[in-house]
């Protein structure tokens, strides 16, 4: 049962309360929320900047606002390069941070440099929800809505249901956070959490690193979720402290005795390696059921698994070995910081020496921007998407 105004509040309710401009926290009712931060990617970023110009805005009101160049990286002609120049000039015009091509994917980079527990974030990218891993209220929206938020106007939406997911246990060996969200996709499907915010709580949360939580929050989008919210705890403090940002940390958690509109439990200890078959993220089966299928491409790196560990583990697996004949191993670093760390620790040498192909840090194959497999060939990918287009 959902809490009343005088009842204990879950974390999502606390975040919404702290940013509520108008409306009531009743599912289905329209609410207006103040946005603290804004995130842009380059496909919709140009449209947002044109909207700001049409408004006659002098300077954006959200701080920080960051324009990331992570989609249009292939410069087969002059168009992407000219878009980059336009966006850089627009950032200077409106007081927006600019992250140029090659710096990395917006979501993990934003977490590292700008994410603050308790703040709200709106982004013109569907996977903006990833910032919920830090205890933020992070929402994806269309270009016009994002432009209005940057101009100081509230973001309007209908109050979502809140699904409380209690995490128990811890991940077994060779099971990752990706398996946790794949299990939820198996349960709910790609549209089962529409108009719903997913809030994770319980003893299993502390066993997940912030980058593990990022994986789960990122793929909440594939379930149709409005947002994903994790508490801000000691793991969050550890993540921020490692980046010299411990001053940004605040502890955040659901109040004892709070309720949710919907509830379920996920025991991490019971999970096994899972995989989503073509062509939908919810077509989930155990990996053991398809073991032995021929593989022609393995693609590692996206906003769905951006952490250093994801690449380092693969590097150790291929160390001193050579990839099989006829297989393309594509390595797509999620950020310049991850790439630098892989170089410093010697992991990149193992990846390159085994025959891997190294791509620039960005969205690339996840959005269909390169690395398309041959017709009829199996491509194993860590990206959130496995459907045509």
What spans do the regions from the language model cover?
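Fe-S-dependent hydro-lyases/dehydratases of central metabolism
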Residues: 1-389
